[in-house]
Structures are given as C-alpha cells and as structure tokens.
C-alpha cells in the first residue's frame, strides 16, 4: 500500500498557533461547533493539540494544518503539514 493511500484516513485539523515556546513543538487551538441536543443552537468550542514542528517554522498567530501521526511523546500525536496563513 502506498504512503499516500495510508495517510488519507488520518485526521487533519486546521487551527491557530497559540504557543511556540517549546523546541520543535507548537500548541494549536482548533475551533469547532456542536449542536446543543435540546435547544439546537450551535455552540462554539475549542480544543488544544500539541503538534510536532521539525524546523520551528510556525509562529504565534499562524493558521496551520496538522495531521494525526504516531505518538511522538507523552502529549504529541500530530505533526505540522502546512502553514496556511502567516501572521503579520
């Protein structure tokens, strides 16, 4: 099986970098919406993920795309795939 086919099933998220203080690690906040079960109102919630940034290229405020990967440490389960938009 080729590498591309295998990676198509992995979770891919897009979020904003909120911390780059660790070496080769960034903290990414991913915002998403859920419908309230009773009132049917859309509720915004966010979740933080630690992602591996091999070259320390992402900075605070950047919009990035991260992909699920094998466990790299105690908390890191994602890696940086693309910087979608650089912060000013």
From Swiss-Prot:
Entry keyword Transit peptide: no
Entry GO CC: cytosolic small ribosomal subunit
Molecular-function GO term, any one: structural constituent of ribosome
Keywords: Ribonucleoprotein, Ribosomal protein, RNA-binding, rRNA-binding
GO biological process assignments: translation
HAMAP family membership: Ribosomal_uS17_B
Subunit details: Part of the 30S ribosomal subunit.
Family: Belongs to the universal ribosomal protein uS17 family.
Protein name: Small ribosomal subunit protein uS17
């Amino acid at each position: 099986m080729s590498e591309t086919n295998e990676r198509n099933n992995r979770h891919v998220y897009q979020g904003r970098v909120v911390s780059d203080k660790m070496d080769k690690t960034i903290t990414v906040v991913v915002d998403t919406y859920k419908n309230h079960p009773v009132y049917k109102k859309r509720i915004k919630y966010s979740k933080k993920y630690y992602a591996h940034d091999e070259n320390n290229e992402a900075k605070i405020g950047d919009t990035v795309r991260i992909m699920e990967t094998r466990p790299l440490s105690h908390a890191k389960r994602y890696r940086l795939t693309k910087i979608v938009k650089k912060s000013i």
